[in-house]
Amino acid sequence: MQHIRNFSIIAHIDHGKSTLADRLIQRCGGLAAREMSAQVLDSMEIERERGITIKAQTAALQYQAQDGKTYNLNLIDTPGHVDFSYEVSRSLSACEGALLVVDASQGVEAQTVANCYTAIELGVEVLPVLNKMDLPQADPDAARQEVEDVIGIDASNAVLASAKTGMGIDEILETIVARVPAPQGNPDGALQALIIDSWFDNYVGVVMLVRIINGVLRPKDKILLMASGATHLCEQVGVFTPKSQPRTELSAGEVGFIIAGIKELAHAKVGDTVTLAGKPANAPLPGFKEVKPQVFAGLYPVESSEYDQLRDSLEKLKLNDAALMFEPEVSQALGFGFRCGFLGLLHMEIVQERLEREFDMDIITTAPSVVYEVEQRDGSIEIVDSPARMPEVGKIADIREPIVKVTLFMPQEYVGPVMTLCNNKRGVQINMSYHGRQVHLTYEIPLAEIVLDFFDKLKSVSRGYASMDYEFLEYRSADVVRVDLLINGDRVDALAMIVHRANARYRARDVVTRMRGLIPRQMFDVAIQAAIGAEVIARENVKALRKNVLAKCYGGDITRKKKLLEKQKAGKKRMKQVGSVEIPQEAFLAILQVEDK
C-alpha cells in the first residue's frame, strides 16, 4: 500500500484538465500510441464536443519514479461542472490528493474554487499546477498570487506545466509521489468500498467504480450494497488502465471496478458502501446522500405518436444517469409527455441534447421550474414541482422557495452590470472581495430566478468573462403566487406559472399581450385574462371578425340598421356561449419560452 497514490484533477472548464490526463497516461504508457485519442477519459461524444467531463473515469498507471521504485498511480477524473458537484465530492473522497489545475493565462475561476473547497473540507492534499505555460500571455506570478489570495493555499512551489507541449509532466508525477499521502486502510478488516461512479454496460450490466477503503474483494464473493440493501454475487473485479483489465482481487487503497450482474443502476448509488454479505462492515462510509433533482421541466414529443419512443429513450438514459427522474404527465395543450427532474440547467441541456442526438427525438421542453415547499393551513407540507399542482390560495399558509448561494468571478470592470443583474433577480449580496484584477462576489439568489436565463444574461453583461457556480442553500419563505391564464373564462392548465408577487403583473401583462398576437381571430370576441386566484390582473381582447350587415342598406331608416346590428349581436352572443377556442401550438411555445424582456 505504500506505493499507491490516489489523486484527481480539479479544474475549470477549458483549463486543460483532460489534456493533462492524456499526457499523464501517455507518459506512464497506459495506452499504446495508436490508441491515444484526444481526451481519452471523456468517453461520451457530447463530453468531447462540449469539452466537459460528466461521468467520473479512472486510469491506473504504473510510474517508475526517480527513487527507482514503481508506484501505482490511480487517476480519478472528476466532472468539473456545478450540476455534478455531488459526483465531484464522491470522486474527491476516494482520493488522498488533488491536482489543482489553473490556466496560467486566465487565473482562478468560480468552479475551481467550489471544487477546491470541497477537496480541502475532505482533507485532500491539494497540489497547484499552472497549466498552459506555452501560451505567450501566460502570467505565472499573477496566477500564483490569485491561487494564494482566493483559495488560500501555498502556491510558491506550484509546478509550471503545459499539457499541450508536455512540459512539466515528469515534475507533476514526482510531486504526486512525494506529496500525496499513501492511502490508509486495513486490508484485513471488514470490506468497505466507496462507489465513486456506476454506469450501465449492455453486456455485463452495471459496472461500479469503487475505491476500496478496508478489506479485500475477490470474484465469487457475495456483496451487499448498504444504502439499498441489495445483495449480489461479484463476478469480476479489475482496474482501468483506461482499458479494463481483470484482476484476481482488489485490496485496501486500490481503485477499480466491480461487475456483479446488477440490472438496475438505481441499486448502485454513487456514494454508497459495498461490503461483504457474509461479514458486513459495522457502518457504511459517511457522506452518502440521495441526489435530489432541483430543476423540473416537462418534455413532450412533437408528434404524440412518439410518446412510447420517448419513454424508452428516457429509460435508456436513466440507465446511465441515476439523477434523472421522470414521470408521465398529461397536459391539455401538449398531450402526453413526461415531467422530468434534473440536477441543474447543464444537466437538463445535456439530457435534451442526448435525446435529440442519440435517439433522434423531436421534443418540446416547457420552461424549467423549481420545487416549492407549500405549507398548508392544516399543517401538512406538500412538495410542488409544477404550477398545475399548486394548491388553492385559501389552503396555503406559507410557500418556501429554494435559495442558492451563487459565487461569481469577474474582471473588475464588469462588477457594476453583474451586480445590477443579481439585484434584478432578487439577489442579496453576502460578500465581495478583490483579488488583483478579479472580483469575487457572493450572492444568495432564488433558484427560480436562475433557471430561466440568468446564465445567458450573465455572459452577455460581462462579455463572457464572468464565471459562476451555485450550490443549494435552503428553503425560505417567499411571496410567490400562481398566475392562471383564462381564455373566455376557462383556465388553461398548461399555461399557469408560478412567479413572485412583485413581478406578477408585469409578467402577466407580457404574456397576455403576446397571446393576443397568437390566438387567431374567431367569429366572436375572445377574452384573454391572467388571474391570481379570483383577481384578474391583466386582460386583452381578441376582436371578433364581423360581417358588414349594413352593406345592403342604402340610406333608409336608422331603425332598420339598428335591427340588423342587434340581430348580429345576438347571434355573436349565442356563438360565444357554445363556441370553443382552439389554441395553436405556437401560443404554448411562446409562453413556455418566456423571456423577461
UniProtKB/Swiss-Prot annotation:
Q: Where in the cell is it found?
A: Cell inner membrane
Q: Main role?
A: Required for accurate and efficient protein synthesis under certain stress conditions. May act as a fidelity factor of the translation reaction, by catalyzing a one-codon backward translocation of tRNAs on improperly translocated ribosomes. Back-translocation proceeds from a post-translocation (POST) complex to a pre-translocation (PRE) complex, thus giving elongation factor G a second chance to translocate the tRNAs correctly. Binds to ribosomes in a GTP-dependent manner.
- GO CC annotations, alphabetized: plasma membrane
Task: Give binding positions for GTP.
Answer: 14-19, 131-134
Domain (tr-type G) spans 2-184
SUPFAM superfamilies named in the record: EF-G C-terminal domain-like (SSF54980), P-loop containing nucleoside triphosphate hydrolases (SSF52540), Translation proteins (SSF50447)
Record's keyword annotation contains Cell membrane: yes
The main location is: membrane
Q: What is this protein called?
A: Elongation factor 4
Q: Which GO terms describe its molecular function?
A: GTP binding; GTPase activity; guanosine tetraphosphate binding; ribosome binding; translation elongation factor activity
Q: Provide the transmembrane region boundaries.
A: none
Q: What keyword terms does UniProt attach to this protein?
A: Cell inner membrane, Cell membrane, GTP-binding, Hydrolase, Membrane, Nucleotide-binding, Protein biosynthesis
Q: Does the keyword Protein biosynthesis apply?
A: yes
Q: What EC identifiers does the entry list?
A: 3.6.5.n1
Q: Which family does it belong to?
A: Belongs to the TRAFAC class translation factor GTPase superfamily. Classic translation factor GTPase family. LepA subfamily.
Q: Which organism is it from?
A: Bordetella petrii (strain ATCC BAA-461 / DSM 12804 / CCUG 43448)
One matching Pfam family: LepA_C
Instruction: Write down the membrane topology.
Output: Peripheral membrane protein
Domain of life of the organism in this record?
Bacteria
**What does the record list as GO biological process?**
positive regulation of translation
Kindly give the HAMAP family that the UniProt entry links to this protein: LepA
Q: What class of enzyme is it?
A: hydrolase
Q: Which reaction does it catalyse?
A: GTP + H2O = GDP + phosphate + H(+)
